[in-house]
Amino acid sequence: MEAKRIRYPIGVQTFDKIIEGGYLYIDKTGYVHELADTYNYVFLSRPRRFGKSLLSSTFHSYFAGEKDLFEGLEAGRLRKEWTRHPVFHFDMSTAKHLNGGQLQRILGYKLSEYEKKWGADSGIAEDDINARFERLVKAAVENTGEKAVIIIDEYDAPLLDVMNDRERLVPMRQIMRNFYSPIKSLDPYLRFVFITGINKFAQLSIFSELNNLQNISMMPRYSAICGITQSELEKDMKEPVRDLADSQGVSYDNALQLLKHNYDGYHFCHGSEDIYNPFSLIKCLDAREFGSYWFETGTPTFLLERLRKNPMDETKLDKMTEIAQSDFDISPELTEDTLPMLYQTGYLTIKGYNKEDHSYTLGYPNREVREGFLRGLLANYKSSEGMSASFVLKFNKALKDNDVNGSLELLQSFMAGIPYDLENKTEKHYQTIIYLVFSLLGYYTQTEVKSAVGRADAVCRTKDRTYVFEFKVDGSAEEALKQIDGKGYMIPYKKEGRCVKVGVNISSATRT
């Protein structure tokens, strides 16, 4: 008899549906109980698709007194009294891509659903959303005799898409500030407030007025509140990993290593254990294939716009040092720096910490993020991710087949096809493109490889050859070859067998 197939909660973000439907669930309810028992106001920042909505839903069920759902879970064991509180749960991810009028209406609709439930229609003007919100909470408390709970999931979602458009941002921000403003004055009526998001918008009343709002985003004991740890993977997902290993024709231990290499590596404070991206991990185990699942859902538009407006040195993203802790929480409104946003959105994570000056080193968390992000950056030069991906595959194959001339012809064609409006003809521009191309070739390729007296642009290894590349802009191939010899770039690879030096010149005029 075939074993019962595991139900993976793909697209399922509500706690009750997961528990009642018998879906795979990693128990995080101990965190929920501890936070509810310790704080009154909590804020958590995590990247998209990292489990924030499921955690919000878990808080909802916990405070709604749905005891049966927690049977056999940590919170069910710890909690003694299951008081039913009126819960106001606002999912702001449904309020994206709107203008001011649409945002006002959808917030009003969210309130009206609760007003019907609690009989809070007091004749307040429909567009007076803050007064309606305040009256609603008070009515629920009066009707039940229990303090209320407010859960705001993805609180910043309505603002993210207009973040780079100040003309639209200012009125939208005012609407959201107005909506959130009653929370402080409602303190006597509130048992608990839980807020999630990606960024920390400084000019919203949530952060300026709620002085007792506890930001747990970088607190070590809550580093694994979202996502999946190695111990959780090996304890609760052993059979899915075995199934993946069988499907891929590798050992169980090799499957674990591949999962770690592709989807692990997130750190939300210094000294924390590695955290897996739960979305990609579960998608991989369900499909039994290693894929770029997080990137299939798309890179946020606001991030791409910010990167175009404020370009970064892509060659240094894998090791950004001397980042202060205050940079992690900096509001996107108050800085043009893209780096904090890359951390907040999950494209970079903490890789190191210096205790002396309290600075952090950031880098890509894993292979999925690194390759997906580099592909996206390369696509910015070609205005088409599909064309860029196809080129990298062909270029990779030519090198593996030791067809250097063919690979250079492909590179020439790729460079010539870059739209003029994306090309600035500086040497740094071409260096960046070369870096992106070679970084995407795979594990056997290294970029900017140091030797004793210099740094080679790229080193590529095939089964029987090692290629050392040097590129010049508006110079000559002969100059590049002389630099390889003069700087001793090939010396470390002589013992590996057949070494080939490749000097390439790029003309900024013809881009060939």
Would you name each region that the model predicts?
Residues 140-144, 437-463:
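Active-site metal-binding core of divalent-cation-utilizing nuclease and nuclease-like domains
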Residues 170-174, 473-491:
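Mg2+/Mn2+-dependent nuclease catalytic core
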Residues 434, 458-473, 487:
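Conserved catalytic cores of phosphodiester-cleaving nucleases, focusing on short active-site segments
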Residues 477-481, 490-512:
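Nucleic-acid nuclease catalytic cores
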